[in-house]
Each structure stands twice: as structure tokens, then as C-alpha cells.
Amino acid sequence: EKKDARVLVAISADDELVGGIVYFGDMAEYGSGGIATTVKNASGIRLLGVSARARGTGTGKALARACIQLARDKGHSHVVLHTTHAMQVAWSLYEKLGFERSKDLDFVQEGLQVFGFRLWLGET
């Protein structure tokens, strides 16, 4: 169990788990490589997943937006996340939500390039 971490889930009308995401209100608990765990005044999101059945329904967007709102509620100035080239659908979603590439957050893990993104929240 991590301090100020939450697992948010999406449940369909017929009570099926169709998506989930992990929100971190304390970047020290974010658990990634690179400098992300040292970032101040930020929330993090990880491990967005949506079932094949629910893809294209806005489930992933709703889960990410819920995390963004949690970050706003904490008064954080930005939200941090990581993804890889293999996650092109998620990458596109993050960009549509306003996340921008943040090369200072990039790192390599076991030979895999991991790309950092940041969403600046502005006035909360």
C-alpha cells in the first residue's frame, strides 16, 4: 500500500470491470525510473487499462480526467505520466487531453525507452 495512491476503476452497466488507472498524489510513491519520483507539486498516473469491449467508449478518457481532477483538488500544478511506443492508443489519448512530451522525464528501463509526459494544470 502506498501513501496517497488510489486505484480508480470503471464498471459497465452490467457490472463488468472495463477499465482502471492508478493515481499517485505523492510522486515519491510513483515508482518509476528517471527523475519522476523527485518532481514536486505534481500528481502521477500509471497503468491505464481499458478492456477490448470498452475501447472507443471514452472509458480511458474518463479515468484519466478523474485523475486530473484529483490533482486539481490537491492544488498540484501538473500531472506526470509515462508511456512507450507500444502504447500508441494511450499516447494519442494523453495528447488529446493536453499532455505534452517532457523529455526530462524520459528514461530507459531494461532496454526499453520510456517517454515522460506532463500536463500543466495552470490556475486551479
Outline where the language-model segments fall.
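Acetyl-CoA-dependent GNAT
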Residues: 1-47, 51, 64-66, 70, ...
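Low-complexity, flexible helical/coil segments
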Residues: 44-46, 55-61, 83, 114-119
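Short coil/turn segments at alpha/beta junctions that flank glycine-rich nucleotide-binding fingerprints
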Residues: 57, 73-77
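C-terminal "cap" of GNAT-fold acetyltransferases
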Residues: 8, 77-80, 84-124
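Conserved acetyl-CoA-binding loop-helix of GNAT-fold acetyltransferases
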Residues: 50, 56-69, 92-96
